Amino acid sequence: MKRLLIAVSLLFWNATIAVAAEPNAMKLHDAPQPLPSLAFTDEEGTPLTLEAWRGKVVLLNIWATWCGTCRREMPTLDRLQAELGSDRFEVVALSIDRAGVGVVREFFDEIEIRNLKIFIDESGKAARDLQVFCLPTTILVSPDGMELGRLIGPAEWDTPEMIEFFGA
């Protein structure tokens, strides 16, 4: 029964994505792709994986404070989370800063990020496992943890088109 529910949910999600246009060069896959197991921590150092968001659509943004385009797009991700963040959708901004959570907290405070939580992978292993070669890279993850699409480079995440795409 659980497998049937997941299959129906995935079909519904794929149908929704097919109706909405691909925004800002988000490349959607023909079929969902498996993701490697990722390990990272939150601001308090609590270990996490993407399993923490099972059942939600996740917009996983891999970024760093030293990346200029990442810094410029972060407020738009914050506004997208403010607009759509719910029990069905979450923006997960995963920093790969080796300097640690302090530089991320300082940056979030500096630009008044209020809706995103801090997640960090100081080792950079998550980015390597995801084959992220350019920052920022943003991955659309299905409620069952599969990669639906990927955008390499920055985007304006809070445009009406993006809100419609993710809110559909």
Report residues per predicted region.
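Alpha/beta-hydrolase fold active-site loops
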Residues: 57-58, 136
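Conserved redox-active cysteine motifs that mediate thiol-disulfide chemistry
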Residues: 54, 62-79
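Sec-dependent N-terminal signal peptides
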Residues: 4-13
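Thiol/disulfide oxidoreductase modules built on the thioredoxin-like
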Residues: 106-115, 121-167
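Structural microenvironment flanking redox-active thiols in thiol-disulfide oxidoreductases
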Residues: 71-111, 122-129
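N-terminal "domain-start" segment that seeds a small globular fold
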Residues: 20-50
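Loop/turn elements at helix/coil->beta-strand transitions in domains of secreted/extracellular proteins
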Residues: 55-57, 87-90, 115
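Cleavable N-terminal signal peptides
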Residues: 7, 18-19
